[in-house]
């Protein structure tokens, strides 16, 4: 089978290519240039070239910087401007890795696209990985349903520690096996505010309000805050921790309150991404990557919006983040929180 493998120069994508090549597939590597971070690509491309030569496979360098800027980078900036919390990895997977890269794979005549994600596929549904600590099904849940039939995740059945051990036994991979893992947003050097600083003044002090609308302090600029944050602002006379409950970007205000006030039992989604045919779901939902799943009921409307009612309340629900719905270990829907 002819398979395009997304290669980053890291351990996971390298082991993915190695495994598929050893199974006798016709493997082609592809490195994506997504952003202009200084010295980022040169080093990675050298690694990809080294692996490709070792495996004796061809590889391509695909410049997707324009698409990435339009579909991921600028929406990241704009979402923070709106006082919301973006999820750039979910957008990147849908539009870039499982979108533009899949188009490129098809243009080469490839039957499948393989990535180093920790997830599994079964009956055209994404499943959680065997290694729950590394499971990436949450970020893949933004994928177009039609893309799933072309995808392969060879590492989904492996534990991360076994991938590293496997990598350390192969000569060309030995220098990669001890690499620091990349877990942060790829185009953010230190903090997301540094990205926003390139486009606007983020340090415009504003008012801190309590939930009754009373001014109780000052903050350093609304873009420094996300829902649930409890530091970096002043609350006069507070005797208990206060958390950001809401952000008003037009007024440059943040509304704060107690942890109890952060509790939410119901929320709405727009443009729900369904992987099964349904108008109602009785399932579990994750409201952020590392959160535990919570039992819920989902009502889906004609305009693809949805209302979610939680069995138990959650804390710190952030508009702009992705909610992912599971039936046991299978992803059945996703959508961005309003």
Curated annotation (Swiss-Prot):
Keywords: ATP-binding, Cytoplasm, Disulfide bond, Nucleotide-binding, RNA-binding, Transferase, tRNA processing, tRNA-binding. One of its GO terms (biological process) is tRNA wobble position uridine thiolation. The gene is mnmA. ATP binds at residues 6-13, 32, 116. It catalyses: S-sulfanyl-L-cysteinyl-[protein] + uridine(34) in tRNA + AH2 + ATP = 2-thiouridine(34) in tRNA + L-cysteinyl-[protein] + A + AMP + diphosphate + H(+). GO terms for molecular function: ATP binding; tRNA binding; tRNA-uridine 2-sulfurtransferase activity. It is an enzyme of class 2 (transferase). The record marks 117, 321 as: Interaction with tRNA. Residues 134-136, 288-289 are annotated as: Interaction with tRNA. Disulfide bonds join 92-186. Its EC number is 2.8.1.13. This is tRNA-specific 2-thiouridylase MnmA. Pfam families: tRNA_Me_trans, tRNA_Me_trans_C, tRNA_Me_trans_M. The active site is at residues 92, 186. PANTHER family: MITOCHONDRIAL TRNA-SPECIFIC 2-THIOURIDYLASE 1 (PTHR11933:SF5), TRNA 5-METHYLAMINOMETHYL-2-THIOURIDYLATE -METHYLTRANSFERASE (PTHR11933). Belongs to the MnmA/TRMU family. Catalyzes the 2-thiolation of uridine at the wobble position (U34) of tRNA, leading to the formation of s(2)U34. It is found in: Cytoplasm. GO terms for cellular component: cytoplasm.
């Amino acid at each position: 089978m002819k398979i395009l493998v997304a290669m980053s120069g890291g351990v996971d994508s390298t082991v993915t290519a190695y495994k598929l090549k050893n199974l006798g597939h016709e493997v082609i590597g592809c490195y994506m240039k997504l952003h202009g971070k200084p010295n980022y690509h040169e080093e990675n491309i050298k690694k990809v070239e080294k692996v490709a030569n070792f495996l004796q496979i061809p590889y391509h360098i695909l410049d997707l910087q324009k698409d990435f800027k339009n579909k991921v980078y600028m929406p990241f900036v704009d979402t923070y401007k709106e006082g919301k919390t973006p999820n750039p990895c979910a957008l990147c997977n849908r539009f870039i890795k499982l979108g533009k890269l899949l188009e490129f794979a098809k243009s080469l005549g490839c039957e499948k696209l393989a990535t180093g994600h920790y997830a599994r596929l079964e009956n055209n549904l994404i499943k959680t990985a065997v290694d729950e600590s590394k499971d990436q099904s949450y970020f893949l849940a933004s994928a177009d349903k039609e893309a799933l039939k072309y995808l392969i995740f060879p590492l989904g059945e492996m534990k991360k520690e076994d991938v590293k051990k496997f990598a350390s036994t192969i000569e060309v991979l030995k220098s990669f096996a001890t690499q620091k893992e990349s877990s942060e947003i790829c185009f953010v050097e230190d903090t997301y505010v540094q990205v926003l600083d390139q486009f606007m003044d983020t340090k415009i002090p504003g008012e801190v309000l309590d939930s009754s609308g009373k001014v109780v302090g000052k903050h350093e600029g609304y873009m420094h805050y996300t829902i649930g944050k409890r530091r970096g602002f002043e609350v006069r006379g507070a005797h208990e921790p206060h958390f950001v409950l809401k952000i008003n970007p037009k007024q440059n205000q943040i509304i704060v309150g107690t942890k109890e006030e952060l509790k939410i039992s119901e929320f709405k989604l727009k443009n729900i991404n369904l992987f099964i045919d349904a108008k109602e779901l009785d399932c579990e939902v994750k409201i952020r990557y590392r959160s535990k799943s919570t039992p819920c009921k989902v009502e889906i409307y004609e305009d693809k919006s949805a209302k979610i009612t939680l069995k138990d309340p959650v804390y710190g629900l952030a508009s702009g983040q992705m909610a992912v719905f599971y039936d046991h270990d299978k992803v059945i829907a996703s959508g961005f929180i309003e």
